[in-house]
Amino acid sequence: MKIVHFQMKRMIVVAWALCGAMAVNAQIQMNAGVQYLQCMQKDMSTDFYDLSNTYFLADSLVSFDTAKGEGLVQWKRYRLSPRQAFNLNGYWPVRMQMLDFPDAAYENDPALKIKIEWITPRTARIRMLTTPVVPKQSDADDVMFCEAFKARKGQSPSASQAPRESRDAVTYSSPYGSIEIQKYPWRIVVKDAKGRILTQTRHLIDNDSTQVKLLPFSFIKRGSDNSRSVNPVLLLSPGERIYGCGESFTSLNKVGQKVHLSVTDPQGPETDGMYKPVPFYFSNRGYGIFMHTSAPVTCDFGASYIGAQRLFMADEQMDFFIFFGEPKDILNEYTNITGKSPMLPLWSFGTWMSRITYFSQEEGLEIARQLRKNKIPSDVIHFDTGWFGVDWQCDYEFAKERFKDPVGMLKQLSKDGFHTCLWQLPYFTPKNRFFPEIIEKGLHVVNATGGMPVEDAILDFSNPETVNWYQSKIEGLMKQGVSTIKCDFGEAAPYNGFYHSGKGGLYEHNLYPLRYNKALWEVVEKNHPGEGIIWARSAWAGSQRYALHWGGDAATNNIGLLGDLRGGLSFGLSGFSFWSHDMGGFVTASPEDIYRRWLPFGFLSSHTRAHGAPPTEPWLISESFTDAFRDCAEMKYKLMPYVYAQAKDCSERGLPMVRALLVEFPHDKGAWLVEDEYMFGSQILVAPLMESGNIRDVYLPKGKWIDYQTGKVYEGGYQTIEAGKIPAIILVRDGSLIPHAPLAQRTDQINWNKIELKAYKADASKCTGLLFKPGDKNIKKIEQ
């Protein structure tokens, strides 16, 4: 009976997802004739040039109920008509009369719902449908939203004035800005509190002044399967700059770029692919947008037309949160919806030592001994792919012949002050001993017949039974004494798969990292209350609740260093407080020079890990390198009170520890241009040496800056500065009070009763800072 019940359940799940997944094949596997490889990032813009599709252009607001905050937008039906002019072939949108039968059953120019509400005085939400069918999923069921947002009870009474309707528009206002819905031509106009237009949607009549017949705000109905996708198009103003979109390795300012928001394995931070795309961005004009969707999005920020943001969404509805304010305001508002990063345990801010890979108990214990022998402050030993019986073959068990007493090993490491992290992944090859069980129990993503869509069994984390099975395996390791788990991969959920959620891969592919992060983080937190932490590679909107993440497989060269720094800054501009990277790069043994210059960036990040192709251990490289490694580690451990307080502040406010200058100095135009320096917290500026040598040009925001190593004072503006003993430029903001601790070899030995407050003062009348000790409930503001 169990077998029959299981088979029936699987058939129901497959049938449930069938319609959606059929559309996925049409939309995703081949876009406008472009064949995509499995899990390749998708360019959704190609669908919006397909002559076989029907195009519906937002035209007018035909009705609106201000009491309900909803109305109807009429969409005019068009087709793309080929046009030849002096041997140049193109297309223009041309009005179309439908040939659908029976014609009385359908609308040529449908009127479809729009809904608007204020969430807070700084956040408005606008939803638009492309079909008469209202989606069934509620906010309470959405995994991208945090629990606090789900629990909210309607609009805050102080969030806005009542909407005002005039002959030409409906206007929603708050103290920070307004949303104006113009009736004809239909537009959404976003203004600041002074009435300045920040951005607005494009209407077809906006093409009247140009030969470029740019498609305005529209949606398509595909000729292949009648599926729909929406294309919001907004104004991009002269001088406008766009930031965010996740852990992007390209230039921080996305204007001029085409950004694909689909989770992929880019094979490193030197390409335009992303392990961690996030459908959120903000502008230097004072607004931000969260595209609430899990479907792929291609953001054309002025790449094809310099005056437009073209958001090519695979989703059939638009659900946008629009934020008002400066970067800190916007990040706080966004993370109030999708969640803030939790405060992480003190030990996690220490040094993590790893390589690919330690293969035995003795090897792990020897690494711990060498760290203590060489007096390198450290807190974590990580075992990567080699702790199983067969390398890379995850079965949640230590290899018996190489790990004679894993529990004893974990106890010894703990006694010596080390926490232990283990690698794993959610894919099971046919040779894995769990493969038959996963298939038999239906714990994997399936295809249209209930079989395998790809070579491996990929755990389906939308299935509660899969989550329970997976967490039981991890829990066994936790009970042995493991502290945390590396949450590797997660980018390969098949687009053509069928998921227990009832959704196809179009909507589940990007959600996969979020579900994976959540399942792992929750079991770690359950077994180590208050110390929930993972080490994850992939992410989506909301994954910041399940910290932390690292930058992936960087090349061991200057470009790998640049890509990681850009990625970390962009990730921080997307709502993630904590982030790390592999010091020296990952792919091959790191040359000593690049590894040495990478060290300060690693130790002045929220989390610090040496990992990659061996050797990563400093004593195996050279004596001088060991000294340099030790110097950087000692610097961070002495700065641990500053690190810990800044981390707490970031977790409460949705701010990044590795912080682009524009976040801290939004009124400094030069700060918006910098992408090879960063603020470590709010008071320390770090400029890594991006090339060989010991000197570099640095941009400093207005004011005085004190060299952390020499005490020399610099004025704001461009300066050429020589690095000190630590191979990086490290400067402290004038008026900073930085708490330091006596040197300790492990975080649990830090003497918090002997904190030294160091004042960095040039012109400032006083020095201020933050202090937060283990056991404290609130951050203390300190002053001297």
Predicted feature residues:
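Bacterial Sec-dependent N-terminal signal peptides
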Residues: 1-29
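N-terminal accessory segment at the very beginning of proteins
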Residues: 26-338, 342, 346-347, 356, ...
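An acidic- and aromatic-residue-enriched active-site/binding cleft used to recognize and process polar
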Residues: 121, 129-131, 175-177, 184-186, ...
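Aromatic- and carboxylate-enriched substrate-binding clefts and catalytic-loop regions
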Residues: 131, 140-151, 200, 377-629, ...
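Conserved, mostly hydrophobic/aromatic
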Residues: 280, 371, 413, 520, ...
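C-terminal substrate/ligand-recognition segments
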Residues: 354-356, 364, 370-373, 383, ...
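Short, acidic/polar
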Residues: 360-373, 467-476
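Catalytic core of carbohydrate-active enzymes
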Residues: 523, 529-532, 541-549, 564, ...
